[in-house]
Structure formats: structure tokens, C-alpha cells
Amino acid sequence: MKKIAILALALVLALVPTLTLADETVRLGVTGAFYEDLWQPAIDKLAEEGIKVELVQFSDFSLPNNALNGGELEVNAFQHHAYFNNDTTTNGYDLQVLADTFVITMNLYSAKYPTVEELQAKVAAGEAVNVVIPNDATNQGRALLVLKDAGIIDLTDDYEGTPNTENVVQVEGGKVELTPVNAAQTYQFLEDSDAAVINGNYAASYGVDPASAIFQENVDLSDERFICLIAVRTADIDNPTYQRVAEVFRSDVTTQVVKEKFDGFFYLTWDNE
């Protein structure tokens, strides 16, 4: 009888994680319509396990961390480490990184110049050039690095983390004017500028082909700054449901949809672990 009781208890304990994960709704904050396609395979798989994931769309990068910190979300997945570190420190949010996900490219696009060499030639000729960049600190810094690598501007080397506009130096003869706008609006200024540096999530949301970029960002997965992440409140870092959400997303179901719909936009961290 004692042996039966022990076996019964062991069976109950084995079922506890499954019961804990069942019938829960996880509100997940994102920025951009493409996340609906990106997350759908994981959402479907999680639903089979009794975990309902509800995507909550935000129109601006400044909102999802505030919503997560305030309890309006359980999880968010929209930002890279550089943004997360700056935003949580600046605003005193009590958030933690649950898992790394991918690097989403930030590329240089132009509606006027089919190649970066043609844009470089205009800069070298001393003609006025207007380039649109994001206006938030971390995405702007990343955009400036893209422009430097593309040969459109130069930068001083006395910055920490990512540069800002004070670090911008004109290349010889250059007259490049930078126009900072909300990151979500960079694509909308493409037709009215010489070029624009556009976050991949917004480019994907507008159906932009990443191959149409006149310069593609040099992606380094050993550099944590621009690796995107899934975040939770610090108190929830060990929550098995949220850990399971991250685990399923970081799996073959997402790899497949990236290959089918978003090839060229994402570099998946779990492919290199």
C-alpha cells in the first residue's frame, strides 16, 4: 500500500508542470504587423498545450516596456539589448531578459538611388544629401553605424555604447543632413529623402524586400547590443509558462516561417548556439 501511495504521489508531481501551464493567457507586446505572422506558428503550438498567447500591438517603441512594467502585459518581444538597457535604466523599470531571439536587420534604403555607390558619389561631389534616421537614442546610434559602414558619414571614436549625432563627422566634401524621425515613420519619409535607415520590423510590416536595400547592415551575432529579446517582469523570470513561450518561439516552428516569409530580415540566435 505504501509503495502504491508513493507511486501515486510521484505521478501527481510529474503532472504539476503540465497543470501549471494549462489554461493561461499570456499578453505579449509587439511593434509591427509582421509579428503576427512571425509568432503565429508558436502561438498555435502553445495553444495545443493550453497556453493562449494574445498579441498586443503598439505603435511606438516607447510603450511596451511601460506596459509590461505596469502589469498590462505578461511578456514583450520587440526590442534589442541596447534599447532595453537604455529604456529600463532611464525609466527605472523592473524588467529582465527572459531569452534572446534574433537580430533583425537595419538597412539603408533609397527611392532615388539604386546603389549605394551612386549615393556615395553624390556625397563625394559635395551635393546636399538628406538621410532619414530614427530619433530614439539606441536606434539612432545603430543607424549612424550603418551610415558609417556605408561610407555616407564618418564618426568620432570617443563614444560609449552607440554614437549620437554629436559624433557625426562629414566625409571629405560631404554635406549630409540627417533628419531624425520616429522609427515607425522612417519608411514614410523614404520618397521625400535621398535615403532612409529603416528598422527591419517596420520594413517588413510595409512589405519591403530586404534585397532592395542599397546597403545592408553588417550583422555580428557576437555583439549583444542589437540582439532582440523576450522580456518579463523581474518577479516572473522563473515563471514556467513564460519560459515555455520563449522555448517554443525559439524552435523550428519559427525558423520555418522566417525562411518562408522573412528571409533576409532575421539572423536567429538559436541557429548559432
Residue positions per predicted region:
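A bilobed periplasmic-binding-protein/Venus flytrap-type ligand-binding module shared by bacterial periplasmic
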Residues: 105-118, 226-244
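Periplasmic-binding protein-like
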Residues: 139-148, 249-270
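Ligand-binding "clamshell"
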Residues: 86-98, 111-117, 190-192, 197, ...
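Short, polar/charged alpha-helical segment
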Residues: 25, 32-57, 63, 67
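Alpha-to-beta junction loops
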Residues: 69-79, 129, 174-177, 191-198
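Short helix-initiation/N-cap motifs at beta->coil->alpha
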Residues: 55-66, 159-188
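A conserved helix-loop-strand patch within extracytoplasmic ligand-binding domains
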Residues: 94, 98-153, 255
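Pocket-flanking alpha-helical
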Residues: 61-92, 203-207
